[in-house]
Amino acid sequence: MAALGGNRDVAGNQNSLEIDSLARFAVEEHNKKQNALLEFGRVVSAQQQVVSGTLYTITLEAKDGGQKKVYEAKVWEKPWLNFKELQEFKHVGDAPA
C-alpha cells in the first residue's frame, strides 16, 4: 500500500488513453520549449501522485532523429480547472533495440 501523497503505479498505463494523451502532451510541450522534433512512440510506465491535482511521472519512448530514446516526463494536471503543465522532461537512456 502506497503512503498518502506517495507515488503509485497507474494500473494498465500502457493501454490508458488518458496516460497516452498526457505523454503526447509532454512531448509536444518539450518540443515547443526546446525547439526539438521528438516524435512520440509509446508509454513504457506511469506513476501518479496526488498533490493539489495529480502529478504524473511518465516514462516514454520517443524518436530523436530516427533513434528511439527513453524519456521521463512529469505532468501536473488539475482537471477541474482544465489545467495541465509539463513540470520536467529529461532523457534517461536509449530504448532497447
Curated annotation (Swiss-Prot):
PROSITE patterns: CYSTATIN (PS00287). SMART domains: CY. A motif (Secondary area of contact) lies at residues 49-53. Pfam families: SQAPI. One of its GO terms (molecular function) is cysteine-type endopeptidase inhibitor activity. InterPro entries: Cystatin, Cystatin_dom, Cystatin_sf, Prot_inh_cystat_CS. The record marks 5 as: Reactive site. This is Cysteine proteinase inhibitor.
